[in-house]
Amino acid sequence: MKEIKPAILFFIVFTILCGGVYPAVVTSIAHAVFPKQAKGSFITDKSGREIGSALIGQPFSDARYFWPRPSATTDFGYNPMTSGGSNSGPTNPDFLKTVGDRVKSLHDTGITGNIPADLVEASASGLDPHITPEAAKVQVPRVAKARGMTMEELKKLVDARTEDRQLGFLGEQRVNVLELNLELDKLSR
């Protein structure tokens, strides 16, 4: 009994500290220092209505828009409640069929040549809001034709919306698809 009292007390104290105090302090600091990010990095329209998050991919399938990476969520696309990659290896027959179907689908829309991997493979979370600048640029002819815009205008827009590596060395250059499409809508008006 002598040894169990400190163990129970230790359990109670650390449950309160780690399960209550620490999360409350970190959440308070996040709301004070990074208020937009702490609330989900929501993007709003002119009227203030939330139309998406800069952190979660959004479904776009209209030819007038740039398309994101495929979603790995199966019940409905880009569902953050069921995110996660397929964990299928590069030689898995199901994975190869899925990628082959996606490549064919993109070729059917007029995309020719090499297709960047991020247009046919879901990200690890299945919710990635970004594509590579190359993935955006191979879509330029389709979007230009659908919107009646020049390819030069769209290439400039993609270049302007390309984000650099974080801290200059982390990750790769990327384009947030939702933000790119919102800019596209502003230009088309």
Curated annotation (Swiss-Prot):
Compartments it resides in:
Cell inner membrane
What protein name does the entry list?
A: Potassium-transporting ATPase KdpC subunit
Species of origin: Geotalea uraniireducens (strain Rf4) (Geobacter uraniireducens)
Q: Which cysteines are joined by disulfide bonds?
A: none
Q: Which family does it belong to?
A: Belongs to the KdpC family.
For this chain, one GO molecular function annotation is: P-type potassium transmembrane transporter activity
- Record carries keyword Isomerase: no
Q: Summarize the subunit comment.
A: The system is composed of three essential subunits: KdpA, KdpB and KdpC.
Read off the PANTHER family from this record: POTASSIUM-TRANSPORTING ATPASE C CHAIN (PTHR30042), POTASSIUM-TRANSPORTING ATPASE KDPC SUBUNIT (PTHR30042:SF2)
Query: Which residues are listed as membrane-spanning?
Result: 6-26
Task: Name the job this protein performs.
Answer: Part of the high-affinity ATP-driven potassium transport (or Kdp) system, which catalyzes the hydrolysis of ATP coupled with the electrogenic transport of potassium into the cytoplasm. This subunit acts as a catalytic chaperone that increases the ATP-binding affinity of the ATP-hydrolyzing subunit KdpB by the formation of a transient KdpB/KdpC/ATP ternary complex.
Q: Which NCBIfam families match?
A: kdpC, PRK00315.1
The answer, when asked if Transmembrane is one of the entry's keywords, is: yes
Bilayer topology: Single-pass membrane protein
Q: What cellular-component terms does GO give this entry?
A: plasma membrane
Keywords from the UniProt entry: ATP-binding, Cell inner membrane, Cell membrane, Ion transport, Membrane, Nucleotide-binding, Potassium, Potassium transport, Transmembrane, Transmembrane helix, Transport
